[in-house]
């Protein structure tokens, strides 16, 4: 029998490259394009 409780993860991709907002919210080392991208995976 098929397991009806099986669920797939929710995947959200954030791509903030090219944003015109001034970079005031972060401190630390020099940012690269990798600092403006993120993948979020969650089990709902």
Swiss-Prot record:
Signal peptide annotation: none
Modification after translation: Contains one covalently linked 15,16-dihydrobiliverdin chromophore.
Principal localisation: plastid
One Pfam family, short name: Phycoerythr_ab
Annotated spans, 15,16-dihydrobiliverdin chromophore: 24-26
UniProt keyword annotation of Cell inner membrane present: no
5-hydroxylysine modifications at: 4
Gene Ontology CC annotation, any one: chloroplast thylakoid membrane
Biological function: Light-harvesting photosynthetic tetrapyrrole chromophore-protein from the phycobiliprotein complex.
Localization of this protein: Plastid, Chloroplast thylakoid membrane
InterPro entries given in the database record: Globular_prot_asu/bsu (IPR011070), Phycoerythr-like_a_sf (IPR037011), Phycoerythr_a (IPR004228)
Miscellaneous: The light-harvesting system in Cryptophytes contains phycobiliprotein complexes. Unusually they are composed of either phycoerythrin (CPE) or phycocyanin (CPC) but never allophycocyanin (APC), with only one type of biliprotein being present in any one species. Unlike cyanobacteria or red algae these proteins are not arranged into higher-order phycobilisome complexes, and they are found in the thylakoid lumen.
Subunit structure: Heterotetramer of 2 different alpha chains and 2 identical beta chains. The subunit composition could comprise of any combination of 2 out of 4 different alpha units with an invariant beta unit.
Region (Disordered), start-end ranges: 1-44
Record carries keyword Transport: yes
Keywords, comma-separated and alphabetical: Bile pigment, Chloroplast, Chromophore, Electron transport, Hydroxylation, Membrane, Photosynthesis, Plastid, Thylakoid, Transport
Organism in which the protein naturally occurs: Rhodomonas sp. (strain CS 24)
Intrachain S-S bonds: none
GO biological process: photosynthesis
SUPFAM superfamilies recorded: Non-globular alpha+beta subunits of globular proteins
Family stated for the protein in its record: Belongs to the phycoerythrin family.
Membrane topology designation: Peripheral membrane protein
Protein name per Swiss-Prot or TrEMBL: Phycoerythrin alpha-1 chain
Binding site for 15,16-dihydrobiliverdin: 19, 21, 40
């Amino acid at each position: 029998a098929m397991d009806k409780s099986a669920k797939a993860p929710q995947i959200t991709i954030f791509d903030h490259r090219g944003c015109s907002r001034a970079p005031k919210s972060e401190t630390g080392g020099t940012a690269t394009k990798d600092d403006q991208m993120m993948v979020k995976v969650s089990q709902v």
